[in-house]
Design a protein with these regions (language model features):
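Amphipathic alpha-helical assembly segments used for oligomerization, scaffolding, or translocation
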Residues: 1-118
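Structured segments of extracytoplasmic/periplasmic soluble domains
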Residues: 25, 32-39, 58, 62-72, ...
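Stable alpha-helical elements in mature extracytoplasmic
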Residues: 95, 120, 124-127, 195-202, ...
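N-terminal "mature-domain start" segment
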Residues: 24-27, 31-34, 38, 53, ...
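Second-shell loop/turn segments in exported
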Residues: 111-115, 184-189, 223-231
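A short, solvent-exposed beta-edge/loop patch
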Residues: 178-179, 201-250
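Short, solvent-exposed recognition patches
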Residues: 125-209
Length: 250
């Protein structure tokens, strides 16, 4: 009896010890997965949807990679074999690094979208000044607004005009706001993406006509407009420079 009972109990004890060790080794990655899933559940919208998909994939792969303890067999030798298998060293460092990287990318993307979602005029002005060809910057006020849309229903919450060195045609006006988009361009800020899209559609009605509005693109809840005096490639390049400055994380 003893010759069979003792080894069997020892095997069970080995098995349980191995399972405890494994559970201990799994704690860090399981906590990381739980914390990350909590962040995903908050449903914060990123600028690049792919960053969220990549993060979800990383979590899914991490879950699959976790070593699980198998159900204990009844045979003594099999239990010993199981214990050895479960106790083998486990290394999740690559998996954890992958989650960390994907989480950082997603959180940065969320911050980037926030920067172009109804930003303050001071933020826009600060970033515009960092674009190499932009010379002067001035925001519209309710008393001095060529379109008369500032803070009105469906109107913009900020409108920042700028002059650009690539515009060589003379543009008349007492100041940058007065000269309007023609001197370089303008950033119009809206509360919602819908309002920005509506404004963009309205501006599109004048494309190619007598009142050529220049280029206009929606990013987040803002419309980036550039002067009709610029060539198409200059408009595109200037728009990209401005956009990249606005989403740059500091």
């Amino acid at each position: 009896y003893f010759s069979e009972y003792a080894p069997h109990q020892t095997a069970i004890s080995h098995f349980e010890k191995s399972v405890d060790t494994l559970n201990e080794n799994n704690k860090a990655i399981e906590k990381q997965i739980a914390d990350t899933e909590k962040i995903i559940k908050e449903k914060a919208e990123p600028l690049e949807a792919k960053t969220l998909e990549d993060l979800k994939t990383a979590v899914k792969e991490a879950k699959t990679s976790i070593r699980k303890a198998t159900k204990m067999e009844s045979d003594t030798q099999k239990i010993e074999d199981q214990a050895k298998e479960i106790a083998k060293p486990v290394d999740y460092s690559e998996t954890q690094k992958n989650i960390t990287e994907k989480l950082t990318a997603y959180q940065n993307s969320v911050k980037q979208l926030a920067q172009i979602t109804n930003p303050k005029d001071s933020f826009i002005e600060e970033r515009l000044k960092e674009v190499d060809t932009i010379q002067e910057v001035q925001h519209a006020t309710e008393e001095h607004d060529p379109n008369g849309l500032l803070n009105k229903q469906g109107g913009y919450t900020a409108s920042i005009y700028f002059s650009d060195s690539q515009v060589t045609e003379p543009v008349y006006g007492t100041d940058i706001v007065d000269k309007g988009t023609e001197a370089g361009g303008c950033i119009e800020v809206y509360k919602t993406k819908d309002e920005a899209e509506k404004r963009n559609t309205y501006i599109s009605a004048f494309d190619g006509g007598q009142l050529n509005p220049g280029s206009h693109y929606v990013y987040g809840t803002i419309v980036i407009r550039t002067s009709m005096h610029l060539t198409a490639s200059q408009q595109k390049s200037l728009t990209e420079k401005i956009y990249n400055k606005l989403i740059e994380l500091k």
